[in-house]
Amino acid sequence: MSERKLFTSESVSEGHPDKIADQISDAILDAILAKDPEAHVAAETAVYTGSVHVFGEISTNAYVDINRVVRDTIAEIGYTNTEYGFSAETVGVHPSLVEQSPDIAQGVNEALEVRGNADQDPLDLIGAGDQGLMFGFAVDETEELMPLPIALSHKLVRRLAELRKSGEISYLRPDAKSQVTVEYDENDRPVRVDTVVISTQHDPEATNEQIHQDVIDKVIKEVIPSSYLDDKTKFFINPTGRFVIGGPQGDSGLTGRKIIVDTYGGYSRHGGGAFSGKDATKVDRSASYAARYIAKNIVAAGLAKKAEVQLAYAIGVAQPVSVRIDTFGTGTVAESQLEKAARQIFDLRPAGIIQMLDLKRPIYRQTSAYGHMGRTDIDLPWERLDKVDALKEAVK
């Protein structure tokens, strides 16, 4: 008898409180990098009814109007109506940013490898901004080489935002969540969607019947291929019956609380570090991107159907302390060969990653909602498949 299993992932919209915080943090990062590409930034944000607090550590000579960046970001998301309890022009903005600790800066600005070494490699100059472990993942379930549950979850909330911003569904408000359960067969291949959960904020006059029908017809059926839906697929749409109060009025939000949404929906392991508000010297962010870059190129090269890459670092040290690749029995070559090839082809020192992926640019605000990985709507360097041939050659 064949054994089938279920796996579930979720996503949240750009109007979710935690995602508002992520987007503000990354908008501040982008604004600083646009003026000072060498800046070190760790910007955290907290949002709640009528108030935004921005705090953290920054080293830069650039001036950025934090108040304006915060308000513009909130307006772009769609919080422009005071009835929402959180509005771009009326919210209180409270910045509290200080300079990066000199104890941390000395290890980032001069890595262990170059201290007292006159013949230094410029890419050894930057040490990791902290210790930690980071994961990257890819699987051949979708065109973008992402797990199907998180890919569909992201597309559902993005579709809701499109319908809200275009005015096609006029009663929608910015806050929303999605969740998709996919059934896998005995070969670990997705065969159908078992359950879809969507909760979307709405104006008080919208009826449950109207919301239910619109979400099924204009969101679910537009996003999920019909081949994955059948008469046993379950839909739970606004299952509480009412979702008028939402966003920061309904729940406080913090930067870095949606790290599973940001990555692989729980399908792969996670090192625990968040991304938003951090410049690329923070390996929580840059090494996670590098690990995805490696994993995606491995799968695209046909060297595995599924690949997970772990990188680990010591603070103030440029070279990773470990590189581990797991192909879960799907690899066509030994994992040790892939690890050796990855070290040869991908420069995994922080400065090497920054150069390889061109990470000093203001590109981060666009990643802070709807996932950092598997994006086909924007051009992200860690999603490129330009190392496929090099990997194939390296493992011959």
From Swiss-Prot:
Pfam families the UniProt entry points to: S-AdoMet_synt_C, S-AdoMet_synt_M, S-AdoMet_synt_N
Reactions the enzyme catalyzes: L-methionine + ATP + H2O = S-adenosyl-L-methionine + phosphate + diphosphate
Region described as Flexible loop: spans on this chain: 100-110
Keywords from the UniProt entry: ATP-binding, Cytoplasm, Magnesium, Metal-binding, Nucleotide-binding, One-carbon metabolism, Potassium, Transferase
Enzyme Commission code(s) on record: 2.5.1.6
Binding site for L-methionine: 57, 100, 251, 282
Single GO molecular function: ATP binding
Residues binding Mg(2+), per UniProt: 18
Cofactor, how bound (note): Binds 2 divalent ions per subunit.
Compartment annotation: Cytoplasm
Cofactor: Mg(2+); K(+)
Biological processes per GO annotation: one-carbon metabolic process; S-adenosylmethionine biosynthetic process
Pathway membership: Amino-acid biosynthesis; S-adenosyl-L-methionine biosynthesis; S-adenosyl-L-methionine from L-methionine: step 1/1
Amino acids binding K(+): 44
Membrane spanning stretches: none
Alphabetized NCBIfam families for the sequence: metK (TIGR01034)
Protein family per UniProt: Belongs to the AdoMet synthase family.
Function in brief: Catalyzes the formation of S-adenosylmethionine (AdoMet) from methionine and ATP. The overall synthetic reaction is composed of two sequential steps, AdoMet formation and the subsequent tripolyphosphate hydrolysis which occurs prior to release of AdoMet from the enzyme.
Assembly, per entry: Homotetramer; dimer of dimers.
Protein name as annotated: S-adenosylmethionine synthase
The organism of origin for this protein: Streptococcus pneumoniae serotype 2 (strain D39 / NCTC 7466)
